[in-house]
């Protein structure tokens, strides 16, 4: 694009840094190649000399004579409705967004993150719907294949949903059946031990008894 933002009388400029940073002014006169006489009657900037390196030229131009007084500048400013036009530009919106982002807290950033995730999820689902609709419209063969795939996916999802319920009932029955042997085992432990078990447990005690009987004989 051709550059059209020239330094001229009536050009509205944005002050990028300095004591009046963030405000708009109108160039009333050009002093030299480095400075200009500016005035901002509607932005509370007094008429003063300002270097060009502090200003960024905008697309707005006011119509008033060379070195006009403040009342003429104010009248032209209000007639052109510069403040509302400036607020509607991308430039002003980006500056406002940057300032709001700098003032955000951790909780605000967390809410923005969750909102972005939700937005991306909604966009993804809508894109998938549009893709499926496009496939169905493209060719009948692909439409049939797509319908079969959708049906298979639905059946698989239904099967997965039913399998855990069956598994849950199966182990429950087995567990109920296993409770009876556990009770029997407890009953066996409570009963007194048999004599044969005593002899098996203490073979060393009965071994010296026969030796003693042989000596007595």
Swiss-Prot record:
GO terms for biological process, alphabetical: cytoplasmic translation; translation at postsynapse; translation at presynapse
Positions where Phosphoserine occurs in the chain: 139
Modified residues (N6-acetyllysine): 79, 85
Stretch list, region 2 X 3 AA tandem repeats of K-G-Q: 195-200
Numbered residues of crosslink Glycyl lysine isopeptide (Lys-Gly) (interchain with G-Cter in SUMO2): 124
N6-succinyllysine: residues carrying this PTM: 85, 206
Placement of Sequence repeats on the sequence: 173-177, 178-182, 183-187, 188-192, 195-197, 198-200
Location of this chain's protein in the cell: Cytoplasm
PANTHER family to which the protein is assigned, alphabetical: 60S RIBOSOMAL PROTEIN L14, LARGE RIBOSOMAL SUBUNIT PROTEIN EL14
Family as reported in the entry's similarity comment: Belongs to the eukaryotic ribosomal protein eL14 family.
Subunit: Component of the large ribosomal subunit.
Function: Component of the large ribosomal subunit. The ribosome is a large ribonucleoprotein complex responsible for the synthesis of proteins in the cell.
Protein name per Swiss-Prot or TrEMBL: Large ribosomal subunit protein eL14
């Amino acid at each position: 694009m051709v550059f059209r933002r020239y330094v001229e009388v009536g050009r509205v400029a944005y002050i990028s840094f300095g004591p009046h940073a963030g405000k708009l002014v109108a160039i009333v006169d050009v002093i030299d190649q480095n400075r200009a006489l500016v005035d901002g009657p509607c932005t509370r900037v007094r008429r003063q000399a300002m270097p060009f390196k502090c200003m960024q030229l905008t697309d707005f131009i006011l119509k008033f004579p060379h070195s006009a007084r403040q009342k003429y500048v104010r009248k032209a400013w209000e007639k052109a409705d510069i403040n509302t036009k400036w607020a509607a530009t991308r430039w002003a919106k980006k500056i406002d967004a940057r300032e709001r982002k700098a003032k955000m807290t951790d909780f605000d950033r967390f809410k923005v993150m969750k909102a972005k995730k939700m937005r991306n999820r909604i966009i993804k689902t809508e894109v998938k719907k549009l893709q499926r609709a496009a496939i169905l419209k493209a060719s009948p063969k692909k439409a049939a294949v797509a319908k079969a795939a959708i049906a298979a996916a639905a059946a698989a999802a239904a099967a997965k949903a039913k399998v855990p319920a069956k598994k849950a009932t199966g182990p429950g029955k087995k567990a109920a059946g296993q409770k009876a042997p556990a009770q029997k085992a407890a009953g066996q432990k409570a009963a007194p031990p048999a004599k044969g078990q005593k002899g098996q447990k203490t073979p060393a005690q009965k071994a010296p008894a026969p030796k003693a009987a042989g000596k007595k004989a």
